[in-house]
Each structure stands twice: as structure tokens, then as C-alpha cells.
Regions:
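Metal-dependent amide/peptide-bond hydrolase catalytic core
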Residues: 1-113, 117-119
Length: 119
């Protein structure tokens, strides 16, 4: 990750001299969660069991989520959702008429039940 200062300087370099950049607020990057940790293996195992056609792999998340607040209680925070969603459903997230199918919801509930049982 990069710091807020580094991000501001990169934007400043891109827009100078046409605009000024002012940081109003923000938070820096969070720690990278290791994939060689038992918690990640539990996610992988439960996912293979409940969502047989899903793949579990690390990825870069370039936006802030509420998960950043969880680092105060646990250093390894994995951002994961066990819901199958169509492109239209993903685009509806945090918008009017946000939705997933009933089947996807129930499958996600089953995934969370198994995760709690494994924890």
C-alpha cells in the first residue's frame, strides 16, 4: 500500500497546474492479510464445501470498507462475500434497489453457519 501523502502527491503531479488538490479526509492502507494462515485456510475449506464452484484467491481491493475498523481487534482481516451475484446485482450494491436472489442469500447464510461451526 501507499500512504495518504503519497496518493495526494501522485494526484497533484497528474493535475498540475490545472487544479489544486486538498485532502479532506481519508485513511491509509490496511495490512495485507496472509494466505498462509489458518484463518485463510478455514475460509478456503468452508467455501469449497458450501460453494463448490467458487474459487478463493487473494486480490487487491482499492477502496475502503468497514473492514478497516476490524484491524483494532484482529490483524488478519479478509474481505469476502459468499453470495453469487450477477453483474446487475453487483452494480446495485449500495444503491437504490440493492438486491441478491433468495437462493444466493440462503447459500450465503449456509456459508456463514459453516464458518461459525469451523471457528
Amino acid at each position: 500500500g501507499e500512504s495518504l501523502d503519497e496518493a495526494v502527491h501522485a494526484v497533484e503531479r497528474a493535475v498540475r497546474p490545472h487544479a489544486q488538490v486538498e485532502l479532506i479526509g481519508g485513511s491509509g492502507p490496511t495490512q495485507v492479510a496472509p494466505v498462509d494462515h489458518p484463518a485463510f485456510e478455514t475460509l478456503r475449506r468452508v467455501t469449497r464445501e458450501v460453494l463448490a464452484d467458487a474459487h478463493v484467491a487473494p486480490y487487491v481491493m482499492n477502496q475502503a470498507t468497514d473492514a478497516r475498523h476490524f484491524h483494532a481487534v484482529w490483524p488478519h482481516v479478509y474481505r469476502f462475500t459468499p453470495f453469487h451475484m450477477s453483474k446487475a446485482q453487483r452494480e446495485s450494491l449500495h444503491n437504490v434497489d440493492e438486491r441478491i436472489t433468495r437462493a444466493s442469500w440462503l447459500e450465503g447464510v449456509r456459508w456463514y453457519e459453516r464458518l461459525v461451526e469451523e471457528a
